[in-house]
Amino acid sequence: MLKYAWQSGPKQRNRWLWHLSNQIWKRSYSSKIRNIGILAHIDAGKTTTTERMLFYAGKTRALGEVHRGNTVTDYLTQERERGITICSSAVTFPWNDHRINLLDTPGHIDFTMEVEQSLYAVDGVVVVLDGTAGVEAQTVTVWSQADKHKLPRLIFVNKMDRPDADFEKCVSDLKDKLETQPVCLQYPVKNDDGVLAINDVITLERLSWQKKDLGRSYRNVKLEPSDDLRVLQEKRNELIDQLSGLDDELADVVISTESFDNVDNALIERALRRATAQQKVVPVLLGSAYKNVGIQRLMDAVNAYLPAPEERNQIYDCFGGEIKRGMRLISARGQAEVVSKLYEPLADEYREVGAVQSGDVVICAGLKSTVTGDLLTSTEEDDELDESAELFAIDPQIPDAVYFCSIEPPSVSSQTAMEQALKQLQREDPSLRVSYDSVTGQTVLGGMGELHMDIIKSRILSDYKIDVDLGPLQIAYKETIEAPALTTQSVEKEIAGSKQSVSITLEVVKNQAELFSLDKSPENLPNLNTLRPRILQVLRKGSISALERGPRVGGQVVETQIRLHNATIGRGTADSFVMATAAQCVQKLLSTSGTRLLEPIMALQIVAPSERISGIIADLSRRRALINDVLPKGERNKMILVNAPLAELSGYSSALRTISSGTGSMTMQPCGFSSMNSVDESLAERRAQGLE
């Protein structure tokens, strides 16, 4: 069976990335495959690290640099112009008799869905930390995503050549902020010439990279007796002691040996591999991707410590098989697909192949209707399809939109082309919401942030040649009921000679657990027992659809449950009529109950020199912000942790640069919704109506 995992970039229409792992089809080479993702906070050096891997593996002839716009994995025009990763990209390269399939993912919060999709396709991840910043906001987010997928991981502490880098602080952050068990395999040291070198804990060697050949070669020299060696031996003993408490094979050797010095390096590495695969520890390595230090040893660690596809103790182990050009596949939804071509990916370049075995990452051309989360198999048996879908289908967690705006084509003749472009972009990016507003007659986009919406507009122009117009960005408020309400809706009509009649009694109540329930009180239960399951489903669907648009600003109604008391459906009444009556009843209830607005709240991390902090805090106070903490950040800077309403943060990046004279930086991400006072609610309503 073959499981869809992630879709490639915008230029590969109908080309899809697959993760094929092996239990049924055992292949001898599958133990030499590593499917990995690379994750990080924005600007931690993730793409630079990937480019160095490609260079040292012989896949590229020159070093790709983000600031020069010549990277392999950041190939979109928008990525090269902005110097950020927007779409996940796949690259494949050999390293020391292994094959590494790597997915380079975005670090910006607006594109977190790209990370979520990519993690379905990998067996382990490398998390890159900025050695000068430690664990940052998006680091915590991607770490949580990896936790959800139970992925083994390595840490690469980057930028350790910089004078303000702090390795010990990074390790402390891993323990405190990520609540993990880091095991340091390397420690930073400066050579006599002041250049970054690495002391290896397991081998007790010093590793020094050569500038003259762009870091292609490095020297590993056994440390002579010295303070450095003594400290490193203590670190090695601590590593053995920690691993022996987690691995029985190593523990048996430790018990029988006279000294930790006698423990073989290969035995330590095998124990570390097992502990990493079981997610008991996280190996920590270091280097400087930009200065070409430490990358080869990072790739060695990927081969040594991250699992092969067949070693994952996950549902992926049950997927296996072979995919060939021209193969016919069936989705769990019963749709047939034909694989017209197969490609081995290198970002936006491809090498066509005839077939691939389980464990490989490939791009498929020709799939017309496959979307994120689909399961494809070669079987056409309904029972097997149903069982496969139940056991293995992916259910991506799509984040709520925080902004929305209208989108208009340049002319009526471009409307269909725009709709097709949006449909394709949604297949690639499920966090993009597209809806039709029946009141205004406009197509409405929902997205994760200002940058997200800007990129969508840019891609429609560059990839589909449609110069669309976006309306002003609006905040994606939500609504919740003020008080419970109960009403009965009775409707009778004759449509095309057929009598349609529905009478239903519904109630809305405060509830966060489920959207729709039955009132099984003694007086209502006999009536509810007469309703067929299909009618109950129709009533549920119609009722819930009305919660998508609240009465005040058209926001989604949340923290609300619809309770069905009774229903009487006339013979021959169409399902669509029943559904519409249920929706009208809920809309009537929402108007009767009244709703309160909930506004999106953002969590910010702001770093600035200490002398600028008071001015920044004063400005935040005017923005209805809640200051959670102010922490030291290095010798001269401080970090402000703050929650603030999204509505107050329009243009805040520019404001921060002005207040801090260009010395401040910030990151922000959604952290939930909060109720509003009546004054702010009135202002939000006026903004939604275009009066502000």
Swiss-Prot record:
Q: Which residues bind GTP?
A: 40-47, 104-108, 158-161
Q: Where is the transit peptide?
A: 1-29
Q: Where does the tr-type G domain lie? A: 31-310
InterPro entries to which the protein is assigned, alphabetical: EFG2 (IPR030851), EFG_II (IPR041095), EFG_III (IPR009022), EFG_III/V (IPR035647), EFG_V (IPR035649), EFG_V-like (IPR000640), G_TR_CS (IPR031157), P-loop_NTPase (IPR027417)
Kindly state a single biological-process term from the GO annotations of this entry: ribosome disassembly
Subcellular location(s) of the protein: Mitochondrion
Please give the superkingdom of this protein's source: Eukaryota
**GO cellular component terms given for this protein:** mitochondrion
What job does this protein perform?
Mitochondrial GTPase that mediates the disassembly of ribosomes from messenger RNA at the termination of mitochondrial protein biosynthesis. Not involved in the GTP-dependent ribosomal translocation step during translation elongation.
What is the name listed in the Swiss-Prot or TrEMBL entry for this protein?
Answer: Ribosome-releasing factor 2, mitochondrial
| Classification of source organism | Eukaryota, Metazoa, Ecdysozoa, Arthropoda, Hexapoda
